[in-house]
């Protein structure tokens, strides 16, 4: 293919060259560009096997024995056979030098910054932060009037008549600079009041002293951690070398700092500025008047200010820590000098002596720990930096209410313009908290000064944006060095307020979801523990009643969750439990493992459940009794170690119980599948046999009796072991009658139940598709059994239903007894749909029995054509072998008397016969499942032994 193309290209090239050279006389005369292409013929051989091997990677070999990394023979990594020399585990510096926790944390942060570009799009992140910054600026501009540009009518305002800065002679500036240089470079002389030790070296110049003085003052106010921050930031600045311990001026800096903390030192820079202020007004009064006259403007020409209630409320209230030793020393010095105490920020006089201060510490702490929020409410100040939140708030008096979040504890605000209320007198006497001068108060707390109204919206907006977008947005805003956002610097006076608002918005953003999640997690465990402990003391019904009274959510969790600490607790349902809609996943293990004997009436069933619950409380198994006793005894006095040990034990028991449940479920599933296959084969054979040669009714009865006999032999007494607890035995005989106390429910409930039965029966008779309506309360797992009958088979059964129904009465009491010996949970199957139905109404098995009895009585009436009086006389004898209570018989009799006049009686008899045949097959299904579960439990018991 290449050969032909190459020849064509050569021909074109030659022709093109000739054409170009022909008309123009030169090679460059035409527009065509010369192209030289060579082509060679090539044969391709198709090798499918090698291509397939290449695709499957058969030519690749594992690199250094690692099958995850496959290389071919041309890969350069094949030359690397030993990486131990380059392994980071052996060759890094960290092997010799162990990092502390803080250093490891910093190193991890550095690694995150190093490799940030691997998993983050930095350009997109920067664009997003820029967008957020623009939004913040727009939001601030919307709130304020042209607040993007600070417009002032001062001396800096441009005036055309005045000379500009370039034209202005710079003599005055030179003079001021020279004066400053002279002041800064003059040698430092220690003031008279400061007695510096002889071994401490003084700074050479006044400028150096001023830097040391201001640094010491800042560290005294802000706390010792700011000294570390300053040292890190100013590491390259030679003027701050005195912060290093080996510097010759460090002892002088420490001496000044100590003197400031003890109150023996006054700042020289402040005193100088005060002197200038005092001397200034006397000399410059006339000049100021002239300036005022020159720059006077009518108030209407000024920019409009926001007039809001905030201006009245927002008064700068400085928070002073009364427990600080410096404040105590100042008060003591003032009391010793017997000078009148200066009023504080709000005009309240300071405490005159140390004794009064200690006695009144709760009042002072209550007063000074408040500060006003923008909405007029008062709020507790957040703890100073470097102090643990728990220890800080535990030292506060008991009158101060403290919430879990630092600095967001709002109290009832006093009316605006008044001071916060003092604490009640009872709080001081009831709490054992005295005045605390703890070690944590050695660090001076940050004075949270609410900003003025023009700055406060900016701080609030930025704090809200940072809480929403994260701390990276704050660092990006801080890096822009915008004058409006100077409060982001830690040395700024409004930084503490900004930090407080940021924490407030952070908690507002993330507090609700975590709180809801924590309450949702705590609720079921609390109710379950309470239920188990109460069941150990007073029996299960009382525990159910107590937990039920605590709220609908807790009642639901308490009734449905009976697995506490990994042990399967026997669920003793009180009559109220039938009105509770239980969760599907919670009831599944209960339905599998609860073994109760059932009778035909609901009252007997409830009384038997009561009897079983009392017997299980009276004779508990040894595996489950000790934990409940431990909970009873050690509930009031559980230490931290005991709690941890108990939690570890509970986790271990949880794992063991979960493993046992999984094994049981797996075994039951496997055996269930095998049993189901065998049952399907047997049913298919029976069905084909009935289609080929229909059996007479007596033979069908014998067949069904034989199947039930086989199932009865399979039901052996076998205890189920789940979670270290034995459940009651299965027995083939019907149970004894329980006590009359539990047997007799109120008569009103009986009447309501009768009414419900009559309504349901009349509803099922009035519908035309009887087959579907009668089998509705069954679970979804039996839908195949319901619909497996073809239409031809249904018609055959319908034609024979009249003659069969009287004869089948012969073996029906036996089947009823056999059904009675099967537990309710197994008869219903373990599906959640069935369990839900059971909680609302009677079990499907009882409905099944009632429908059978109804169809039999109707068929009897049709075949024998007896009078109503005879039929009424024969009815008690027909039901005497089956029912123990009188109310079901009466209800059946009354329902039959009402339904005699119904026009659709014939259709009802036919459909009831079909339903009874389908029900017999479903009952066989259920018995097969029971056998499978029992076989699985036997296998589990033998493997455990």
From Swiss-Prot:
Gene name tied to this protein: Sfswap
The protein's name in its UniProt record: Splicing factor, suppressor of white-apricot homolog
Keyword Transcription attributed: yes
Function: Plays a role as an alternative splicing regulator. Regulate its own expression at the level of RNA processing. Also regulates the splicing of fibronectin and CD45 genes. May act, at least in part, by interaction with other R/S-containing splicing factors. Represses the splicing of MAPT/Tau exon 10.
Coiled coil: 632-686
Modification Phosphothreonine, positions: 639
Residue numbers bearing the Phosphoserine modification: 283, 601, 621, 829, 831, 899, 903
Compositional bias of kind Basic and acidic residues: 9-21, 169-178, 589-598, 643-679, 733-752, 811-821, 895-908
GO cellular component: nucleus
Chain positions found as N6-acetyllysine: 315
Compartments (UniProt record): Nucleus
């Amino acid at each position: 293919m290449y050969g032909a193309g190459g020849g064509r290209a050569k021909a074109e090239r030659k022709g093109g060259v000739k054409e170009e050279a022909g008309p123009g006389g030169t090679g460059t005369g035409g527009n065509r560009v010369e192209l030289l292409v060579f082509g060679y013929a090539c044969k391709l051989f198709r090798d499918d096997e090698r291509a397939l091997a290449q695709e499957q990677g058969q030519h690749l070999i594992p690199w250094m024995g690692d099958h995850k990394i496959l290389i071919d023979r041309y890969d350069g990594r094949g030359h690397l056979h030993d990486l131990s020399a380059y392994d980071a585990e052996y060759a890094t510096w960290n092997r010799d030098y162990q990092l502390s926790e803080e250093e490891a944390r910093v190193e991890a942060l550095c690694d995150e910054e190093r490799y940030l570009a691997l998993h983050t799009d930095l350009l997109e992140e920067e664009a997003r932060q820029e967008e957020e910054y623009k939004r913040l600026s727009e939001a601030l501009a919307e709130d304020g009037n042209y607040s993007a540009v600070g417009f002032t009518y001062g001396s800096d305002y441009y005036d055309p008549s005045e000379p500009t800065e370039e034209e202005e002679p710079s003599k005055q500036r030179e003079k001021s600079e020279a004066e400053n240089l002279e002041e800064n470079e003059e040698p430092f002389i220690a003031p008279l009041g400061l007695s510096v030790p002889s071994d401490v070296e003084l700074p050479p110049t006044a400028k150096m002293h001023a830097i040391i003085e201001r640094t010491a003052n800042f560290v005294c106010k802000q706390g010792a951690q700011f000294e570390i921050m300053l040292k890190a930031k100013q590491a390259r600045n030679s003027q701050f070398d005195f912060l290093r311990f080996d510097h010759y001026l460090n002892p002088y800096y420490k001496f000044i700092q100590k003197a400031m903390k003890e109150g023996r030192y006054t700042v020289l820079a402040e005193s100088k500025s005060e002197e200038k202020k005092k001397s200034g007004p006397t000399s410059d009064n006339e000049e100021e008047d002239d300036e005022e006259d020159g720059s006077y403007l009518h108030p209407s020409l000024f920019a409009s200010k926001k007039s809001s209630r905030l201006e009245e409320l927002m008064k700068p209230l400085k928070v002073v820590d009364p427990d600080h030793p410096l404040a105590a020393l100042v008060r003591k010095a003032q009391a010793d000098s017997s000078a009148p105490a200066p009023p504080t920020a709000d005009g309240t006089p300071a405490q005159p002596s140390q004794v009064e201060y200690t006695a009144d510490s709760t009042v002072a702490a209550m007063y000074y720990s408040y500060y006003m929020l923008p909405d007029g409410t008062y709020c507790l100040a957040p703890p100073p930096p470097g102090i643990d939140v728990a220890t800080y708030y535990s030292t506060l008096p008991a009158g101060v209410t403290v919430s879990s979040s630092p600095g967001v504890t709002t109290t009832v605000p006093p009316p605006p313009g008044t001071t916060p209320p003092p604490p009640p007198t009872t709080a001081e006497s009831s709490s054992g908290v005295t005045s605390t001068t703890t070690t944590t108060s050695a660090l001076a707390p940050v004075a949270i000064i609410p900003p003025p109204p023009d700055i406060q919206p900016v701080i609030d907006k930025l704090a809200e944006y940072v809480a929403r977008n994260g701390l990276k947005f704050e660092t990006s805003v801080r890096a822009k060095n915008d004058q409006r956002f100077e409060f982001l610097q830690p040395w700024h006076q409004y930084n503490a307020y900004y930090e407080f608002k940021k924490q407030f918005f952070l908690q507002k953003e993330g507090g609700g979801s975590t709180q809801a999640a924590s309450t949702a997690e705590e609720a079921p465990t609390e109710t379950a523990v309470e239920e188990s402990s109460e069941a150990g003391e007073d029996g299960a019904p009382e525990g159910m009643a107590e937990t039920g009274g605590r709220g609908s959510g807790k009642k639901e969790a308490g009734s449905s969750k009976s697995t506490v600490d990994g042990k399967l607790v026997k669920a003793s349902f009180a009559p109220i439990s039938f009105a509770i809609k239980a969760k599907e996943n919670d009831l599944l293990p209960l339905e599998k493992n609860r073994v109760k004997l059932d009778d035909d009436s609901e009252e007997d069933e409830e009384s038997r459940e009561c009897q079983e619950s009392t017997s299980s409380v009276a004779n508990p198994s040894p595996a489950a009794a000790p934990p409940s006793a431990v909970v009873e005894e050690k509930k009031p006095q559980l230490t931290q170690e005991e709690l941890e040990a108990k939690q570890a034990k509970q986790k271990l028991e949880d794992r063991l119980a979960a493993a046992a449940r999984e094994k049981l479920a797996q075994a039951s599933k496997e055996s269930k599948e095998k049993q189901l296959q065998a049952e399907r084969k047997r049913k298919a054979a029976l069905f084909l046999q009935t289609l080929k040669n229909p059996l007479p009714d007596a033979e069908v009865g014998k067949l069904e009796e034989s199947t039930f006999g086989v199932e009865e032999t399979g039901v052996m007494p076998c205890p189920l072991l789940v979670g270290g607890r034995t459940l009651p035995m299965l027995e083939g005989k019907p149970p004894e009658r329980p006590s009359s106390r539990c047997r007799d429910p109120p008569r009103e409930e009986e009447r309501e139940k009768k009414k419900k039965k009559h309504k349901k029966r009349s509803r099922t008779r009035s519908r035309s598709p009887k087959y579907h309506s009668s089998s509705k309360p069954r679970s979804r797992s039996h839908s195949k059994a319901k619909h497996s009958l073809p239409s031809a088979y249904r018609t055959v059964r319908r034609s024979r239903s009249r003659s069969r129904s009287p004869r089948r009465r012969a073996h029906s009491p036996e089947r009823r007894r056999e059904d009675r010996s099967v537990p309710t949970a197994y008869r219903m199957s373990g599906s959640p749909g069935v369990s839900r139905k059971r909680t609302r109404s009677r079990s499907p098995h009882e409905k099944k029995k009632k429908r059978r009895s109804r169809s039999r009585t109707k068929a009897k009436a049709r075949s024998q054509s007896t009078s109503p009086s005879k039929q009424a006389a024969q009815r008690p004898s027909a039901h005497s072998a089956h029912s123990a209570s009188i109310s079901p018989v009466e209800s059946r009799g009354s329902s039959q008397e009402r339904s005699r006049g119904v026009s659709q009686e014939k259709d009802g008899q036919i459909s009831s016969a079909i339903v009874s045949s389908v029900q017999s097959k479903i009952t066989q299904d259920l018995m097969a499942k029971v056998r499978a579960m029992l076989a699985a439990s036997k296998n589990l018991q033998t493997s455990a032994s």
